[in-house]
Amino acid sequence: MSWTKPAYTDLRIGFEVTMYFASR
């Protein structure tokens, strides 16, 4: 993904946090 957007960054961070908690 080369396009950068604040909303996309928030979504990506939230997704990574969700995956982090889901893999625990």
Curated annotation (Swiss-Prot):
Please cite one Gene Ontology biological process associated with this protein.
Answer: pyrroloquinoline quinone biosynthetic process
What Pfam families does this protein's entry cite? PqqA (PF08042)
Instruction: Enumerate the UniProt keywords alphabetically.
Output: PQQ biosynthesis
Q: Does the keyword Transcription apply?
A: no
Q: Where is this cross-link: Pyrroloquinoline quinone (Glu-Tyr)?
A: 16-20
Which pathway does it take part in?
A: Cofactor biosynthesis; pyrroloquinoline quinone biosynthesis
Which InterPro entries does the record associate with it?
PQQ_synth_PqqA
Q: Which domain of life is it from?
A: Bacteria
**Coiled-coil positions:** none
Which NCBIfam families does UniProt cross-reference here? PQQ_syn_pqqA
What is the annotated role of this protein in its UniProt record? Answer: Required for coenzyme pyrroloquinoline quinone (PQQ) biosynthesis. PQQ is probably formed by cross-linking a specific glutamate to a specific tyrosine residue and excising these residues from the peptide.
Concerning HAMAP family, the annotation shows:
PQQ_syn_PqqA
Which family does this protein fall into? Answer: Belongs to the PqqA family.
Name of the featured protein: Coenzyme PQQ synthesis protein A
